[in-house]
Amino acid sequence: MVRGAVPRTTEFGELLYGKAVNLGGRVLIYGLGRSGRGVAHFLHGEGVSAFWHDLRPAPEDEALMRQLGHRQADLGGTYDLVVAAPGVPIDHRDLRVLAGRGAEIIGEVALAARLRPELPMVGITGTAGKGSTTVLIAQLLRACGLRAREGGNIDPPLLDVVDDAEVAVVELSSFQLERVPGLRLPVAVITNLGVDHLDRHGSVETYHAAKLNITAGQQSGDVLVRPADLPVPTRAQTVTFTPERLCLRDGQEVLPVADLPPGVHPANAAAALLAAEALLRHLGRAVDPAVLADALRAAQPVKGRFETVGQLGEVGFIEDSIATRTIAVESALRQARPPIAWLVGGRDKGAELAPLRAAAEGRVTRVIAFGEDGEALARDLGLPFEVIKAETGDESMDRAVRAGWEALGGAGGTGTVLLAPVGTSFDQFRDYQQRGASFRRAVQALLGTQSGSGESA
């Protein structure tokens, strides 16, 4: 859909959920950062001069707001519409007060769905694998001739892609799914459900309820793709997958699992295949198994998701900085080639460790603990460990990478140095991407020193 294909208005957006979006009143962007910047650009494109609020705005964000004509908000005022960033809890005091004064509180996903109702969206959520599955679905749809763009919880923000896509493939976090009441997706995917974000949701039940909002607005003509062992209440048609087979809805095998490229997880590929098929059928497009098979063979894994970033002799270095959920860390431990030097650290968010002990048994030779809660996590894991102390995140990562390599025997050693940190990045880094970049830089530095010493890399 090209920009302007759906009529725009500064008064009222298209109806969805039986309610209009009031862009003619006072609109507040609550929270900047990646999502807020996407909202700001989108509203500017709609001809809307909005207000914004952020407790600690970055100088570049303030400059962008001025450039786009958005003004800093007075929270003592009243607003008709508040577009809140996903990281702002739904029960935040400011939002409760604003709602009490008559504001409607929504998120970027609801804004996109209401103002671009003709754009088909595939929504993907889950505790682990949702980003990789999102990218895979978009790759498959592009191979089938559709202009599919991925966005949402992964880069870029959803609102950055809605005017340059025939199909939006949207990764949806539990935070985003708290603000999409009634969202109807022709195709929705749940990759799995584990434990995460208890600091935000308070309980596993509340976290799972937020995730299941992805199918709450679906109807009998829509499709929900889910794991075969995960029952989900829904009005949609249910299609299930397992990691053992890459097949279409009728059971026809498209590709042997063994033919997937390295770094592409079979469960993610199986879910992506079924979702792509469902969307093609929704649009009345042909489903060609040969095209889909070729696309799977050529699939590109997502950077920073269990990615091999270096090799020094028989020791590989794998970056999985985003692996902070138990289910994701467990998957990384089971996939990595043993023996493993496991880099664990960051800020503990209450991950369940028992499954990780089981996955590490007989595979992990040493835990390298770094960051704010690394030592505490290592002690709770009950595995042999050493603690890295450093002033900065980069220095900590340099030492952790070298310690991991040495734990595997250094030159002449074998195995995997695995960054699957369990803890979040916010103790020493801006986000998981910056932490992953630090790991990559540390690996390259180590490779450089060893190459200079005559070792093969």
Swiss-Prot record:
One of its GO terms (molecular function) is ATP binding. Its EC number is 6.3.2.9. The keyword Isomerase does not apply. Pfam families: Mur_ligase_C (PF02875), Mur_ligase_M (PF08245), MurD-like_N (PF21799). InterPro entries: Mur-like_cat_sf (IPR036565), Mur_ligase_C (IPR004101), Mur_ligase_C_dom_sf (IPR036615), Mur_ligase_cen (IPR013221), MurD (IPR005762). Disulfide bonds: none annotated. ATP binds at G126, T127, A128, G129, K130, G131, S132. SUPFAM superfamilies: MurCD N-terminal domain, MurD-like peptide ligases, catalytic domain, MurD-like peptide ligases, peptide-binding domain. One of its GO terms (biological process) is cell division. Pathway: Cell wall biogenesis; peptidoglycan biosynthesis. It catalyses: UDP-N-acetyl-alpha-D-muramoyl-L-alanine + D-glutamate + ATP = UDP-N-acetyl-alpha-D-muramoyl-L-alanyl-D-glutamate + ADP + phosphate + H(+). It comes from the Bacteria. GO terms for cellular component: cytoplasm. Keywords: ATP-binding, Cell cycle, Cell division, Cell shape, Cell wall biogenesis/degradation, Cytoplasm, Ligase, Nucleotide-binding, Peptidoglycan synthesis. It is found in: Cytoplasm. Cell wall formation. Catalyzes the addition of glutamate to the nucleotide precursor UDP-N-acetylmuramoyl-L-alanine (UMA). Belongs to the MurCDEF family. NCBIfam families: murD. This is UDP-N-acetylmuramoylalanine--D-glutamate ligase.
